[in-house]
């Protein structure tokens, strides 16, 4: 978690349509899952499970879908495919997370995650270039 905090404090800003910049879907999913897993203390296996799993794992997965859509600029269809879910499931996840941003604690976590995922992608893109 300390590493994620340092990344967040570096001040990287999210840019839309990161997926179009040549970062592979596997890398995209790995970066998002790793960040969400660390912040919400959910095992990666639970986050990637084909079934809904625990309430905690399902919520963390919804956050991951939200980040893929908002930070990485994926369409809801692409988010659904990335997480082996339907497009409507991805849409529901994004609406749910957006509605819950009124909670200051959750909103703070989401802001940190957005910056962290953006920074990690900046690093991946720089390495590829």
What are these model-derived regions, one by one?
Residues 58-73:
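Short, amphipathic alpha-helical "recognition" segments used to contact nucleic acids or chromatin
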Residues 89-91:
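Helix-turn-helix DNA-binding helix
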Residues 69, 93-94, 98-101:
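DNA major-groove recognition helix of helix-turn-helix
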Residues 77-83:
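Short alpha-helical "recognition helix" segments of helix-turn-helix
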Residues 1-34, 128-129:
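General nucleic-acid-binding
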Residues 6, 14-18, 100-129:
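Intrinsically disordered, low-complexity basic tails/linkers immediately adjacent to helix-turn-helix/homeobox/MYB/SANT
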Residues 38-61:
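Short, Lys/Arg-enriched anionic-surface-contact patches
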Residues 33, 75-76:
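Helix-turn-helix DNA-binding elements, focusing on the entry/boundary residues of the two helices
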């Amino acid at each position: 978690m300390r590493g994620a905090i340092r990344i967040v404090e570096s001040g990287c800003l999210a840019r839309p349509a990161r997926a179009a910049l040549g970062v592979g879907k596997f890398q995209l999913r790995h970066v998002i899952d790793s960040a969400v897993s660390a912040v919400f203390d959910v095992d990666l296996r639970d986050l990637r499970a084909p079934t809904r799993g625990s309430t905690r794992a399902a919520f963390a997965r919804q956050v991951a879908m939200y980040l893929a859509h908002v930070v990485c600029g994926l369409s809801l269809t692409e988010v659904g495919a990335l997480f082996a879910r339907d497009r409507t499931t991805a849409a529901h996840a994004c609406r749910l997370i957006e509605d819950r941003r009124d909670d200051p604690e959750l909103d703070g976590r989401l802001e940190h995650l957005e910056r962290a995922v953006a920074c990690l992608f900046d690093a991946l893109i720089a390495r590829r270039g």
